[in-house]
Structures are given as structure tokens and as C-alpha cells.
Amino acid sequence: MIQAETRLTVADNSGAKVLGCIKVLGGSKRRYASVGDIIVVSVKEAIPNSKVKKGDVMKAVIVRTKKEIRRPDGTYIRFDDNSAVLINATKEPIGTRIFGPVARELRAKRFMKIISLAPEVL
């Protein structure tokens, strides 16, 4: 469950290290986002000479959350961190590599490029 002001780690090699959630997209009253949802983020920390700079405002898709996700078969999955992947206007990842596992729910949301780049899909 990600909401405004939440800090997230970055699961790609775009150059950003820490993101801050500004807004959860999907209606003015929407408060929380989960895996596969798109949020507006600000880059809080970035490495030098990278594609993104500190203070950049962009969109990101959530790939891991600490809050467990209930699957249709009754099982739950949760991760050790809240992580996101930066995306461009066409919903393609900015980075060329994804680090760590990602949730299977991304496939239903049609983020196939992220699924194919990820080392493990849980």
C-alpha cells in the first residue's frame, strides 16, 4: 500500500536510487496504490551522470510492496521492500535492467517489458 509521501527504492538501472510518491493515479479520491499501479514520483536520490536527476518528476510502476497481496487462489505474497520502476509516457521502462524479483500481477496489467527484463517473477 503506497500513498503520497511514501519513499520507494528503485528496481532498475535508470540512475535513481530513492523515489518519493507524489500522487496515486486513478481518480481524485484514490489514496493507495499496490503492485502494478502507476504513481507520480519525484527522484529524491540519484547517482551522478545518470539518465534522471534529483528533483525530476516522472511516472513509475510499483513492482514490490511490503503489504501482502492476496492472489485469487487464496495465497499471499509480500516482499521485503517497496520498489518501483521508472517508466516513460508509453509505459516502457527507462532503465535497461530490472533488479530483484517482481510480482506476477504485472503481467495482468500488461507490463510485459518489465516482466521480460526481471530476473524472477513470483
UniProtKB/Swiss-Prot annotation:
One of its GO terms (cellular component) is cytosolic large ribosomal subunit. SMART domains: Ribosomal_L14. Transmembrane segments: none annotated. One of its GO terms (molecular function) is structural constituent of ribosome. The keyword Ribosomal protein applies. InterPro entries: Ribosomal_uL14, Ribosomal_uL14_bac-type, Ribosomal_uL14_CS, Ribosomal_uL14_sf. CDD domains: Ribosomal_uL14 (cd00337). One of its GO terms (biological process) is translation. Keywords: Ribonucleoprotein, Ribosomal protein, RNA-binding, rRNA-binding. It comes from the Bacteria. Part of the 50S ribosomal subunit. Forms a cluster with proteins L3 and L19. In the 70S ribosome, L14 and L19 interact and together make contacts with the 16S rRNA in bridges B5 and B8. Binds to 23S rRNA. Forms part of two intersubunit bridges in the 70S ribosome. Belongs to the universal ribosomal protein uL14 family. This is Large ribosomal subunit protein uL14. The gene is rplN.
